[in-house]
Amino acid sequence: MSFDNHLVPTVIEQSGRGERAFDIYSRLLKERIVFLVGPVTDESANLVVAQLLFLESENPDKDIFFYINSPGGSVTAGMSIYDTMNFIKPDVSTLCLGQAASMGAFLLSAGEKGKRFALPNSRIMIHQPLISGGLGGQASDIEIHARELLKIKEKLNRLMAKHCGRDLADLERDTDRDNFMSAEEAKEYGLIDQVLENRASLRL
């Protein structure tokens, strides 16, 4: 995750060995909180993957909390996060704050069943994968890329159908165009398990 260092607060902690300064995200990582903020890119995905692997090494039996505020982005980068979430031993609880769109929504749905949350004013959007950038070249190359895109679309729909507890036909229909949902609508659809009004409403 990339942030402007001038905008990231620093937390000072006192211990028997004196003072220690943490940027706020490193401090929250100690609480097993991982953030995905902004577009899903190779860089942001690598940082998330590294943090997930680190937290597993610290304690393989304790949940990890994955906070998502993302408009989506690269499918391959997102799938590296998805595969790591499934690869590691700890349960990964997901929470949407702000928005989870496209690959962000896919990752939100991929949290541990019963531990997928959204704050009440979050927006969730699902759709079919897009080709990033202009696609040019020979007709045969364009055909190859089109076939690959259809394979990716089918795979994402199958996986999301599994996570949402829905038929594949539902996902094929509902991702045909941009499909925006409120937190409550995302819960009804099966993308999340609970809308959190406040911390006291959390049920695990």
UniProtKB/Swiss-Prot annotation:
Biological process terms in GO annotation: protein quality control for misfolded or incompletely synthesized proteins
GO molecular function (one): ATPase binding
Source domain of life: Bacteria
Localization in the cell: Cytoplasm
Catalytic reaction annotation: Hydrolysis of proteins to small peptides in the presence of ATP and magnesium. alpha-casein is the usual test substrate. In the absence of ATP, only oligopeptides shorter than five residues are hydrolyzed (such as succinyl-Leu-Tyr-|-NHMec, and Leu-Tyr-Leu-|-Tyr-Trp, in which cleavage of the -Tyr-|-Leu- and -Tyr-|-Trp bonds also occurs)
Gene Ontology cellular-component annotations: cytoplasm; endopeptidase Clp complex
Family annotation (CDD domains): S14_ClpP_2
Keyword Lipoprotein applies: no
Active site: S102, H127
Keyword Disulfide bond attached: no
EC numbers for this chain: 3.4.21.92
Coiled-coil ranges (or none): none
Transmembrane segments: none
Family the entry assigns: Belongs to the peptidase S14 family.
Role this protein plays: Cleaves peptides in various proteins in a process that requires ATP hydrolysis. Has a chymotrypsin-like activity. Plays a major role in the degradation of misfolded proteins.
Assembly and oligomerization: Fourteen ClpP subunits assemble into 2 heptameric rings which stack back to back to give a disk-like structure with a central cavity, resembling the structure of eukaryotic proteasomes.
Name under which the protein is recorded: ATP-dependent Clp protease proteolytic subunit
The species this protein was found in: Neisseria gonorrhoeae (strain ATCC 700825 / FA 1090)
